Amino acid sequence: MLKLLLGDPNTRKLKRYQPMVEEINLLEEDVSILTDDELRNETHNLKSNISSELNIKKQKELLEETLPKAFAIVREASKRVLEMRHFDVQLIGGMVLHEGQIAEMKTGEGKTLVATLPCYLNALTGKGVHVVTVNDYLARRDAEWMGQVHRFLGLSVGLIQQDMSPAERKKNYACDITYATNSELGFDYLRDNMATEIEEVVQRKFNYCVIDEVDSILIDEARTPLIISGQIERPQEKYQKAAELSLSLIKAKELSKDGIDPEGDYEVDEKQRSCILTDQGFAKCEEALKVNDLYDPKDPWAHYITNALKAKELFVKDVNYIIKKDEAVIVDEFTGRVMPGRRWSDGQHQAIEAKEGLKIQPETQTLASITYQNFFLLYPGLAGMTGTAKTEEVEFEKTYKLESTVVPTNQIRKRQDWADQVFKTELGKWKAVANETAEIHRNGRPVLVGTTSVEKSELLSSLLFEQQIPHNLLNAKPENVEREAEIVAQAGRSGAVTIATNMAGRGTDIILGGNSDYMARLKLKETLMPLLVKPDNEHKPPIPQQRNSKSGGGFSANVDSIANKNTKSGVDSLFPCQLGEDIKRKLSLLSNELVKNWGDRSLTILELDDKIATAAEKAPTEDKLIQSLRESLSEVKNEYEKVLIHEEENVRNAGGLHVIGTERHESRRVDNQLRGRAGRQGDLGSTRFFLSLEDNLLRIFGGDRVANLMNAFRVDEDMPIESGMLTRSLESAQKKVETYYYDIRKQVFEYDEVMNNQRKAVYNERLRVLKGNDLKKQVIGYGERTMEEIVEAYINPDLPPEEWDIDQLISKVKEFIYLLNDLKSEDVSVLSIEELKNYLQEQLRIAYDLKEAQIEKFRPGLMREAERFFILQQIDNLWREHLQSMDSLRESVGLRGYGQKDPLIEYKNEGYDMFLEMMTNMRRNVIYSMFMFQPKSEKVTNN
């Protein structure tokens, strides 16, 4: 009703941007007549003007005034460098981002290009801009591709990659615009706050940040905090013993009800992802291990057994992790990508290693941690882009104070979303998926099938193999990941079939008919790699054959209209045609030239990729070899385009890309992302989801209603079921899961919010020390506070002075400051409480000056070094212990809910007390250490 009365708020918002769009369009002609150098000068002048304004409010006003001109300049630079002109809707997207909102833009609407607008504008402040992507590949791609626009305009562009040294990181963070992944940014922030010298700090103060695929980073990854950890030794045989014991324990068929244990040794709660021993299970374990109590603090076992059971029941090989080089590597449940270097905490990873018979790595202890929620809230300016924000609008608003605005598409969407097909069994579903894939493939349309795990993608692959359908497999297995660019490049070709886990296509558009640009790059890589890249057994050949049918038919087996002599019947390799002799000869000459200059097999694969990527750019280059590489790349691309243009026409006529979803994801948003791969930029396309009543979502969250439905439907397994009640069950299950995970994220956020205030206080204190402006004043401040605390601890103001315990007080002061050994009770017995505090603080300052004089005799400046060392040492050690204590507190307050107490309030109150105690201990330890510090004489001694 409100919508009818007031109109759609989104439409009202968009109307507000229209006058600004018109102003930018009016400026287009004026800007287009400027030379390249004049455009760069404009940038230089704008930057000088804006960065010199120190008042933040006035600087913001200047940015608003500059916006139309800045956007017009970026649009012009993009036309010249990328041959891409920002549409009006993309200008609106840029304004939405500049205002610190989330821009929802559909797949293929050019989100990456939109980001150049607010990034350029905010970089004019000179304070730096971060563009955040979900993986290293996308960060590198965007820095190379969109970075051309910024470099052309005279701004510096940085890139942060996983294997960079601190010096390289510092240099890249100092650039005007820096591209990085969310995890690299977060870990650098934590490492900076563990630095022992100011020179080790790599990041600048945060300013403005644009997050690409914002939902993936701020929502999907928000349940998992970033943790830097150090190793601690734990007995490895306990993991092995627990793994063996878990195999003999029997799982209960149902969960306990009303406190009554079911039959069996343990119960599994898939929803909570937990395993709980029954009384029978406890007894069995205690007997097998010959112990009286699994929770005995001197010899604890419960934790090991629970982890072993979770490894057995809830962590599935090829779904949650894969084995690579004798290591268990985590697979990201949202993207389907492997996450090397990441490990599950609390001994869970060790339990999985024991289960798989792998070498057990040492367990770790948290040294520093932060959640993505609190990390990104450190940015004064935060914005994001995604294809699907509206489903999570409330969470963005509540947690991050980010509004969402839907930016209209440039062209009308022509995609058709076909009705879901639901099957009684999983097997029936997979057969139907294989049949529909085969049918659409035979019609000459490309098909993308999204699966939820490595295991499922391989099951479908075997079914298609039986039907003799050639296809490509893209999942977390290393041999497939290395072919990602190649597989996506040909996923839009006529009759192409691509099976992909959730990683499907984030950041890479599937172009109908095939991507000639990618294919040309890969052709050059295939040609140059054997000659230029160091031999390395790690790397598979870059272009392995696709999984073909026994008949040898290829993608285009039934499409006979590609009129080109060079086209093979059925694309049995990646490339659409054989290159002409002329181009082959040129490539051969180029190869010899490159070997002569770059060395015989002396580059890494990454270096070769970078050189080919640079050649693919349009930015001017002085490097003659890159120019030659660029010419060859262009010729190969043109040759391929001649063939692919026909193929594109055929694919369009056949109906475009068809996307098949094989399971509803826990979040409707991920389903929408998969659908969004089809019908980009007004293309034709279609989508369909195939589901079964045995799918995880329905099984775990569907409740009894779905179980009853299963019994009610007496239909064959390969007969699709259509039922309104079923569709409603499905939607309610998805909403239930979304709410469930939102509550978990909210809880993670609320608990980390308590830690966040403490973290800020500790990190600010550390930064003060690293900058070292006035360390002496800081330490004396600690001492004065300690003297106050000693007086308050030993003097009761309610008692008469003659009853005060002055002797104990003096004794305590001497414990901290041995230089005050001459201090006597009678010196202070006549003083009031305030006078006593002032007197002791005065004595402390005198003693500290005396100590400084002693230390400085050894070496000038040694006292300041000692102050920095002891403060940092105490902060780091006590903070580490505090993190452990807060973890334990969080676990224990959960039980207080049973006593009608709010666990979060208990956590806040006790956490605050523990934090105050930690800071008190830190001050006291520093004072004690400073007075006890005795440098070793630097005389040379003979041993």
Curated annotation (Swiss-Prot):
One of its GO terms (cellular component) is plasma membrane-derived thylakoid membrane. Pfam families: P-loop_SecA (PF21090), SecA_DEAD (PF07517), SecA_PP_bind (PF01043), SecA_SW (PF07516). GO terms for biological process: intracellular protein transmembrane transport; protein import; protein targeting; protein transport by the Sec complex. It is found in: Cell inner membrane; Cellular thylakoid membrane; Cytoplasm. One of its GO terms (molecular function) is protein-exporting ATPase activity. It is a peripheral membrane protein. Gene3D superfamilies: Helical scaffold and wing domains of SecA, P-loop containing nucleotide triphosphate hydrolases, SecA, preprotein cross-linking domain. It is an enzyme of class 7 (translocase). SUPFAM superfamilies: Helical scaffold and wing domains of SecA, P-loop containing nucleoside triphosphate hydrolases, Pre-protein crosslinking domain of SecA. Keywords: ATP-binding, Cell inner membrane, Cell membrane, Cytoplasm, Membrane, Nucleotide-binding, Protein transport, Thylakoid, Translocase, Translocation, Transport. InterPro entries: Helicase_ATP-bd (IPR014001), P-loop_NTPase (IPR027417), SecA (IPR000185), SecA_CS (IPR020937), SecA_DEAD (IPR011115), SecA_motor_DEAD (IPR014018), SecA_preprotein_X-link_dom (IPR011130), SecA_SF2_C (IPR044722). Belongs to the SecA family. Part of the Sec protein translocase complex. Interacts with the SecYEG preprotein conducting channel. Has a central role in coupling the hydrolysis of ATP to the transfer of proteins into and across the cell membrane, serving as an ATP-driven molecular motor driving the stepwise translocation of polypeptide chains across the membrane. Probably participates in protein translocation into and across both the cytoplasmic and thylakoid membranes in cyanobacterial cells. This is Protein translocase subunit SecA. It comes from Prochlorococcus marinus subsp. pastoris (strain CCMP1986 / NIES-2087 / MED4). The gene is secA.
